[in-house]
């Protein structure tokens, strides 16, 4: 890398998954620990160098190498700077002959020191929606029953939903999706957008050092 020290606010990388396959656009690493470590360790050290003190890094992978990557990330960024292991859950059936269907990717979220974080919200689940209906809604604001006479009382704040948890349900891109650009392992724009909104602000510098289909730049 030729970037100055501490010049990046957020790093997101959809890294090599260690499948050993040739995808045409690139040759993936083999799922061998020494090969994974030799490839990633020097790159992680450089990523830490360019990341600002309040910066964040997200690395996306699947279950083939996430256990090795967690060890490397702890070594480079520090166990105390681990923030979340996010599961991107999708429905994609395969012809697996043994074990449970594999339907999630792993996204490791670390900070360099004290990272910025913008809480993201999601809509209430159906049970909560039913409860909200019982409480009542007036002029778009959530209200609840008074204890004394049963009349409705407005709440002071708008209903934002609930804070986003660490299991993200989001479908893979379909072959006919409009945002498809012909890259086999392309990730949904909405997935990367969620990460950018959570850990960066307007005008921040976001880096993707495994820029496959270019989705991060969109």
Identify the residue ranges that each predicted region occupies:
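Core catalytic lobe of class I
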Residues: 1-218
């Amino acid at each position: 890398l030729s970037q100055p020290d501490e010049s990046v606010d957020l790093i997101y990388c959809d890294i090599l998954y260690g499948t050993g396959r040739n995808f045409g656009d690139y040759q993936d690493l083999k799922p061998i620990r020494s090969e994974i470590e030799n490839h990633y360790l020097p790159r992680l050290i450089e990523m830490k160098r360019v990341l600002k003190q309040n910066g964040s890094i997200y690395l996306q992978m699947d279950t083939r190498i996430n256990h090795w990557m967690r060890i490397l990330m702890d070594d480079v960024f520090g166990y105390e700077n681990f923030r979340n292991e996010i599961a991107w859950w999708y429905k994609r059936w395969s012809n697996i002959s043994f074990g449970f269907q594999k339907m999630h990717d792993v996204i490791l979220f670390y900070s360099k020191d004290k990272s910025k974080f913008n809480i993201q919200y999601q809509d209430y689940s159906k049970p909560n929606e039913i409860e909200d209906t019982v409480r009542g809604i007036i002029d778009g604001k959530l209200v609840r029953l008074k204890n004394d006479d049963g009349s409705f009382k407005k709440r002071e704040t708008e209903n934002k939903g609930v804070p986003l948890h660490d299991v993200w349900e989001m479908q893979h891109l379909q072959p006919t999706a409009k945002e498809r650009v012909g890259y086999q392992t392309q990730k949904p724009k909405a997935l990367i957008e969620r990460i950018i909104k959570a850990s960066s602000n307007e005008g921040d510098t976001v880096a993707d050092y495994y820029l496959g289909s270019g989705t991060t730049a969109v």
